[in-house]
């Protein structure tokens, strides 16, 4: 199972790929330029690990709190991928997780 976690709600654009029990991540500056090329950042990131968008099993996107523009952009990209490739997506919010030690990106699929 290949899960992709996207968080553009904060100071960095954070991408995490959970591929067959292995965890890979990358972060980028959260700027207008990177908002405009979020799809390219995602494509390049998963391509690094020999995956295509269609091979992603589930998508997870941070729905806040944080930058409205970042949330709007990342949610739009995730919805587009979901519709085009028929991949389920889930929104998460770290504030909903409660217990501090669970607030890790790698726990998002378990907690959602």
Residue spans of the language-model regions?
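N-terminal beta-alpha supersecondary unit
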Residues: 1-58
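Short beta-strand segments
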Residues: 5-7, 62, 111-112
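Anionic group-transfer/hydrolysis microenvironments
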Residues: 9, 64, 95
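Short glycine-/acidic-enriched loop or helix-start segments at secondary-structure transitions
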Residues: 15, 70-71, 101
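Stable alpha-helical structural segments in soluble proteins, enriched in small hydrophobic residues
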Residues: 45-49, 78, 84, 101-103
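DPxDG-like acidic metal-binding loop motif
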Residues: 58-63, 68-89
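Conserved phosphate-binding catalytic cores of ATP/NTP-utilizing and phosphoryl-transfer enzymes
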Residues: 92-110
């Amino acid at each position: 199972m290949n899960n992709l976690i996207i968080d553009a709600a904060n100071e960095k654009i954070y991408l995490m790929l959970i591929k067959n029990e292995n965890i890979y991540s990358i972060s980028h500056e959260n700027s207008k330029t990177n908002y405009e090329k979020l799809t390219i950042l995602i494509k390049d990131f998963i391509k690094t690990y020999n995956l295509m968008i269609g091979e992603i099993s589930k998508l997870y996107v941070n729905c806040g709190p944080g930058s409205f523009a970042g949330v709007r952009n990342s949610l739009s990209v995730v919805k587009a991928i979901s519709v085009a490739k028929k991949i389920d997506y889930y929104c998460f919010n770290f504030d909903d997780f409660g217990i501090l030690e669970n607030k890790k990106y790698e726990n998002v699929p378990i907690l959602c």
